């Protein structure tokens, strides 16, 4: 996404890459037959106001799920979890891989589940999932919120309170959430409510990728590590105590090489709830 932002002639490299991959899709031997098995549907027996979709990466980082549900419990939210048993994909990895037909089939199946839930809010904490829900799903009448938007709203409405500390936090803008969806202010509002915000010397739409991008699968380990270390160098220039992000993939990637704690914004919020 950053190439498209900084390109002086406005070439949208990310869209070109996906279009090129879609031309190669039939030469790639992957099995997506699981979308016909029905096993990924999960079970929702009760209708709630908020439908929480964790996504694949949050299923692999359960501390984020625990924090998000703790926040909803504290706010007295009426919610259920769409993929509490795991196994549901939003479809974006297939779309980015050029498997548009398979992605659209997944989107169609997920749309039926979401609409049948009766929820008025779809809560998502993975920016990759959030972007496809906003851009490729037809969910009229259902508000789609990233958890940074949701937490910021809970604080502003007085539904939760955060005990502010002297901790210095630096916030990392995930590619898909910032450049991809334009969400910059809400997460910073939450961080400021929890402690002192120290900005990285490169942030916002210029933010550096964590190195875990699913859109650059051709990059080898050494190049990905170099990207991560470069991002950490810029994030830690102000000597923060904690690195905060709002993407489970970013958190996992930074944790491999960071010399200080890395936390999701939901974890920062949950541990300081009053």
What kind of feature is each model-predicted range?
Residues 2-274:
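Iron-sulfur cluster-binding electron-transfer modules in prokaryotic oxidoreductases
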């Amino acid at each position: 996404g950053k190439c498209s932002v900084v390109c002086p002639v406005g070439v949208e490299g990310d869209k070109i890459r996906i279009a090129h991959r879609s031309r190669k899709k039939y030469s790639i031997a992957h099995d997506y037959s699981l979308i016909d098995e029905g096993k990924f549907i999960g079970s929702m027996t009760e209708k709630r106001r908020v439908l929480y979709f964790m996504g694949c990466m949050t299923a692999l980082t359960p501390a984020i799920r625990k924090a998000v549900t703790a926040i909803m419990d504290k706010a007295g939210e009426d919610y259920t979890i769409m993929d509490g048993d795991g196994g549901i994909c939003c479809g974006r990895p297939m779309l980015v891989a050029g498997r548009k037909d398979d992605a659209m089939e997944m989107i169609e199946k997920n749309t039926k589940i979401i609409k049948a839930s009766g929820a008025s809010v779809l809560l998502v904490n993975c920016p990759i999932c959030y972007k496809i829900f906003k851009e490729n799903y037809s969910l009229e009448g259902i508000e789609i919120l990233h958890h940074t938007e949701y937490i910021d709203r809970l604080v502003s409405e007085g539904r939760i309170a955060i005990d502010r500390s002297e901790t210095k936090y630096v916030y990392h803008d995930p590619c898909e959430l910032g450049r991809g969806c334009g969400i910059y202010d809400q997460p910073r509002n939450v961080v400021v409510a929890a402690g002192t915000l120290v900005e990285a010397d490169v942030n916002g739409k210029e933010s550096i990728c964590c190195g875990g991008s699913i859109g650059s699968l051709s990059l080898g380990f050494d190049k990905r590590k170099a990207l991560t270390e470069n991002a950490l160098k810029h994030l830690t220039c102000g000597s923060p105590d904690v690195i905060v992000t709002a993407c489970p993939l970013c958190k996992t990637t930074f944790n491999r090489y960071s010399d200080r704690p890395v936390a999701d914004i939901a974890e920062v919020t949950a541990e300081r709830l009053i």
